[in-house]
Structure formats: C-alpha cells, structure tokens
Amino acid sequence: IDNSTLEFDFRDKHYLAFRHKATFRLQRRYKDTSAQYFDTIPTIKDIINNKGFQRFVNDLPLAVPDSMAVRYSASVNSVHYFSVLPYGLNDLAVNKTLLEDVSVKNEMYFTIKVTFNQNGGGEDFEDVFMYWIHRETYKVDYIAYSYSEDDGKGIRFREGYNERYVEGVRFVDYNNYKPEDSAISLTDLPQLFEKGDLKLLSKIELENVTLKIN
C-alpha cells in the first residue's frame, strides 16, 4: 500500500489513492446531477494531497470556503481510510490498547482500542475505534467506532464480508450496523450483534478494485 495506486468505485463515485514514499494523493470523482454548470452536468473532482484540499469542476479549480473544505476533506478521507484498514494504524498519531479477548459467533478475537492524538490525528481525532482481530487468522473481521454528531455521539459496528485479494492485498466489504442506544460502550457491540439487537443501516461495498504497485 505504501507505494501503490489504488482505484475503486463506491456507490456513484470513483476513488483513487496514490501513495509513494512520503507523497500521497487521495481523489474522489463523480458527476453532480443535482447541479448544472454552463448547461452541463458537472464532473466534480476532490483531491487531498500533501498541500491540502482542492476541488475541481470540469477540471477547473474552484475556490471553496475553509469550512466546506474541511467537510469535503473529511468525506473523501473517510472512504479512503476504511478502504484499506488496518493499514495506517501504525501512524505516529495512533494509540492502540489491547483489551480483553471476546468470543463472536464461537470464534475468539483480540480486542484493540484505537484513539488518536490531537496533533496529527486529523479533524476527527476524538473518534474512538475498536478492532476485533481473529486470534488464529489475524484478520480484522469486525470494527466499531464512535464519532461526534451535532446532536451527540454516533456509533457504528461493521461486519466484514466478501473477502478478496488484489495484488496480495486483502479487501472486504462491510455490513454497517447501528445500536438503538448511542450511550452504550463499544465493547458491548459484539454481544448485541450476536443477539441480533443491531440495526442494519447499509452495506459498504467497494467495486472494480484495482491496485498497481508504483
């Protein structure tokens, strides 16, 4: 992953991630059918790189307010972040804590809690993640995270499925669940999942995945 070009489609958007040593470019491209630009449906391209965020409309740079740039950046970065997990968890801003092992569907899992330093942790440094890693395969099968919303805290639990390998790199899709009570602990989610007490919100499916070593 450190030196590669990754491309995939997610819902109605195309994503590209270029990484080479210390250089990176995370890109999202899509047609904005809700807007018109000189009587045409515009193609939007959002790019995050070492210099920051930039939006292009029909390949022409468009200045956006700082507040919107933060929102667009977070949206682009979130999809790219989840697409290659657990890659990135050894970054300097990441703090990992090993918790108690748990059983999920009669399989034993290591539990790893992940938090982020404010310095280098990005806009969402207060988010908390939990990873359940199979004790024998060392694969991440389940993920949970909490994040801040305007009206409080949001919680999600993801179940990996559709495992496949592209150029030796593992990719999975996710069933995306939500608990009824957002005040519960992330560590309670595997048991709620086993009981069927989580609500399935959506499926996170990456399509047309290609990976090229740079």
Predicted segments with their positions:
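N-terminal mature ectodomain segment of secretory-pathway/periplasmic proteins
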Residues: 1-59
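Short, hydrophobic/aromatic-rich segments at coil-to-beta transitions
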Residues: 2-7, 23-32, 105-113, 140-142, ...
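Short, surface-exposed beta-strand-loop junctions and turns on beta-sheet-rich folds
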Residues: 23, 32-34, 61-63, 148-149, ...
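Gly/Pro-enriched, hydrophobic low-complexity segments
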Residues: 108-211
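A structural detector for beta-sheet-dominated domains
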Residues: 9-11, 19, 27, 56, ...
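Flexible, processing/modification-adjacent segments and terminal tails
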Residues: 49-122, 150-151, 213
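Short solvent-exposed loop/turn micro-motifs enriched in small/polar/acidic residues
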Residues: 9, 37-39, 94, 124-126, ...
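Short, exposed beta-strand/loop patches in secreted or surface proteins that constitute
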Residues: 14-21, 44-47, 95-103, 131, ...
